[in-house]
Amino acid sequence: LTMNVLFVCSRNQWRSPTAERIWRRTPGLTARSAGTSRNAIKTVTPELLLWADMIFVMEQKHKNRLVAEHRRLLEHKPLHVLDIPDDYHYMDPELITLLEQSTEPFLAPFIKK
């Protein structure tokens, strides 16, 4: 069984694609990313939320927006706020460290050795 993990930021430009890239080749996980903004590279859709077993958002505002727009789809999904500000570029080493440290405790049980 594979755990489907969705990472969400605003524009799907720096933070969530970095998280997707970090975890996408991990056995036991399937990672995707999207943004809450209408002009995101990939915008969050109901289909993506249904697909996801676990959702990580970078900031509280992303959770607020998802809940406002998709409350019923999120009722029984684990949704974690990482509190990672929009201060980093794609694959920034500091961003990678923050993402790994904040998500690994939740993802470790699902990683296949």
Question: Where are the model-predicted features located?
Answer:
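Conserved active-site segments centered on acidic
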Residues: 1-54, 64, 101-113
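Phosphate-binding/catalytic loops
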Residues: 67-113
